[in-house]
Each structure stands twice: as structure tokens, then as C-alpha cells.
Regions:
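Short, basic-rich loop-to-helix N-cap that marks the start of a DNA-contacting helix
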Residues: 39-50
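Short alpha-helical DNA-recognition segment
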Residues: 15-34
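Absolute protein N-terminus
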Residues: 1-3
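Short, charged recognition helix plus adjacent turn
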Residues: 6-9, 14-15, 34, 41, ...
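Residues within the helices of the helix-turn-helix
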Residues: 8, 19, 49
């Protein structure tokens, strides 16, 4: 499960919207919303990598956002 609050916070820090980010990583906006809300498939490794690059996330930030349930 994605830590939605942290992801949204990073998106806002970069002065982007979810629509902007989804377009940059080539994911349909509705699909992106479903994935962050846990409705259906999770993000693929390729998608996590693309998001991390667009938002300039550190490894620790990416882990906290995308893998927090596995680490905690």
C-alpha cells in the first residue's frame, strides 16, 4: 500500500498535481488515482522508478512512500 500522504506531500513540494505527474510517467490519471487509493493493481517497479525520478526522491523517501508496510 502506498503512503498516500507522503506521496501527495512530495507532489505538492514539486509544485505538481497528480494529473501532471501521471502524464509525465505515462499513466492514465484515473489509473494513477486507483493505484494510490489501493483500488486494483499496485504500482509496478517501472512506475515507482519513474515517480521517484520525477519527484527526485531519495531511496529512503521512495521506500517510505511505496514500501512502508513491508519495512514497518
Amino acid at each position: 500500500m502506498v503512503n498516500v500522504d507522503k506521496l501527495r506531500g512530495k507532489i505538492v513540494e514539486k509544485r505538481m498535481s497528480i494529473a501532471d505527474l501521471s502524464k509525465k510517467i505515462d499513466i492514465d490519471k484515473a489509473t494513477f488515482y486507483r493505484k494510490i487509493n489501493g483500488e486494483g493493481e499496485t504500482f509496478s517497479i517501472r512506475e515507482v522508478d519513474a515517480i521517484a525520478k520525477e519527484l527526485n526522491l531519495t531511496i529512503d523517501e521512495a521506500i517510505a512512500i511505496f514500501f512502508s508496510q513491508f519495512v514497518a
